Curated annotation (Swiss-Prot):
<protein>
    <recommendedName>
        <fullName>Lipid-A-disaccharide synthase</fullName>
        <ecNumber>2.4.1.182</ecNumber>
    </recommendedName>
</protein>
<dbReference type="InterPro" id="IPR003835">
    <property type="entry name" value="Glyco_trans_19"/>
</dbReference>
<keyword id="KW-0443">Lipid metabolism</keyword>
<comment type="pathway">
    <text>Bacterial outer membrane biogenesis; LPS lipid A biosynthesis.</text>
</comment>
<dbReference type="GO" id="GO:0009245">
    <property type="term" value="P:lipid A biosynthetic process"/>
</dbReference>
<dbReference type="GO" id="GO:0005543">
    <property type="term" value="F:phospholipid binding"/>
</dbReference>
<keyword id="KW-0441">Lipid A biosynthesis</keyword>
<comment type="similarity">
    <text>Belongs to the LpxB family.</text>
</comment>
<dbReference type="Pfam" id="PF02684">
    <property type="entry name" value="LpxB"/>
</dbReference>
<keyword id="KW-0444">Lipid biosynthesis</keyword>
<dbReference type="GO" id="GO:0008915">
    <property type="term" value="F:lipid-A-disaccharide synthase activity"/>
</dbReference>
<dbReference type="GO" id="GO:0016020">
    <property type="term" value="C:membrane"/>
</dbReference>
<keyword id="KW-0328">Glycosyltransferase</keyword>
<comment type="function">
    <text>Condensation of UDP-2,3-diacylglucosamine and 2,3-diacylglucosamine-1-phosphate to form lipid A disaccharide, a precursor of lipid A, a phosphorylated glycolipid that anchors the lipopolysaccharide to the outer membrane of the cell.</text>
</comment>
<keyword id="KW-0808">Transferase</keyword>
Length: 386
């Protein structure tokens, strides 16, 4: 079997390598060609360009690099047509891959897109383009699959790799011991984001909320895992003149450990909310942005919720506080509800564990099964979510 793969960034390389392993278990003689990173190369990928080609050109100075990006896509199209793979799989990088998939599918080649763009949230009209571009969409989340099914796009919900990676049962006390924190005092994990703008917009409010909460929860411990050295430096600047410096434990990375150790989590919306859910920890999701960005987002985003736990559950499980609503007091009150109501907290942890089990499906194997069925039988498995 010949398989053409195009990944555009580090996360795609990780997903691609897992998919290649699963496909090789089914087809030991499988050949792989396209664009991949070091993990995919280690699995036998023949990559025509470095992994960074698409991530740099696709996300940084897009207009400046557009001619080069178009040149790369034309080259890949010619190369794929000459090599004649059984299937072409675009891994994430939708702005680049969907165009290539559409061009190749028009020639009769089977195409698959692995990792849905957030078309369900904004610019929903893109689903028509996706329908013309792919023979199958492989999604991480069940509500994504439901969206594509409503629009008659062949889809398989394969589960989430992060859910596969995290255990269904975790050890709060072991995590606290590893972090050197008290095993009995209440603990709040604070994750203000991985981007500089998030620290700028959320950092001061999150620290104010921690102080507000500690005044009402004696002995409260607060741990902040910095997402990168740059974010740590920004947090250190904020803490230098902030009263929270007296009790905040600032760490390098260790976000998963911090969330597992915590009784509650305060975080920006994004993947961290999913990870907190998969650690089975109650959370408050808060987000602030530039006024113009918020004005635009309100008009473009079509979903009732912004956080993945609520979207996955299709109900409000965790508070979402956005822009003016994300005040120090509002955040503090929401956190106090979690910390002060053990029954509610434990019920939410149990619900998160159940959602975790729903997402823990062996994503790479499920994706390989769907691709194999498409190539061999010309269709997805009859019950891909069973």
């Amino acid at each position: 079997m010949r398989i053409y793969l195009v990944a555009g960034e580090l996360s795609g390389d990780i997903l691609g390598a897992g998919l290649m392993q699963a496909l090789k278990r089914r087809h030991p003689d499988a050949e792989f060609r396209g664009i991949g990173g070091p993990r995919m190369l280690a699995e036998g990928m023949q990559s025509l360009y470095p992994l960074e080609t698409l991530s740099v050109m696709g996300l940084v100075e897009v207009l400046k690099h557009l001619p080069g990006l178009i040149k790369v896509r034309r080259h890949l199209r010619r190369d794929a047509l000459a090599w004649q793979p059984d299937v072409m799989i675009g891994i994430d990088a939708p702005d680049f891959n969907l165009g290539l998939e559409r061009q190749l599918r028009a020639t009769g080649m089977r195409t698959v897109h692995y990792v849905s763009p957030s078309v369900w949230a904004w610019r929903q009209g893109r689903v028509k383009t996706i329908a013309r571009s792919v023979d199958a969409m492989l999604t991480f989340l069940p509500f994504e699959a439901a969206f594509y099914a409503r629009h008659q796009v062949p889809v398989a919900f394969v589960g989430h790799p992060l859910a596969d990676e995290l255990p269904l049962v975790n050890d709060r006390q072991a995590a606290r011991t590893a972090l050197g924190l008290s095993s009995t005092a209440p603990l709040l994990a604070v994750l203000p984001g991985s981007r500089g703008n998030e620290i700028r917009f959320l950092g001061p409010t999150f620290l104010d909320s921690a102080v507000w909460l500690r005044e009402r929860v004696p002995g409260l411990q607060v741990v902040i895992p910095a997402a990168s050295p740059a974010r740590r430096q920004e947090l250190e600047v904020l803490l230098a003149t902030h009263p929270a410096r007296e009790f905040v434990h600032l760490r390098d990375g260790e976000s998963r450990q911090a969330m597992t150790a915590a009784d509650a989590v305060l975080l920006a919306s994004g993947t961290a909310a999913l990870e907190a859910m998969l650690c089975h920890r109650p959370m408050v999701v808060a987000y602030k942005m530039a006024a113009a960005t918020h004005w635009l987002a309100k008009r473009m985003v079509k979903t009732e919720w912004i956080s993945l736990p609520n979207l996955i559950a299709q109900e409000t499980l965790v508070p979402e506080l956005v822009q003016e609503d994300a005040s120090c007091e509002a955040i503090g009150e929401a956190l106090l509800t979690w910390l002060g109501d053990e029954t509610h907290r434990q019920a939410t942890e149990t619900r998160f564990a159940a959602l975790h089990a729903t997402l823990q499906r062996g994503a790479s194997e499920r994706a390989a099964e769907a691709i194999d069925s498409l190539v061999v039988h010309g269709r997805l498995p009859e019950e891909p979510t069973a």
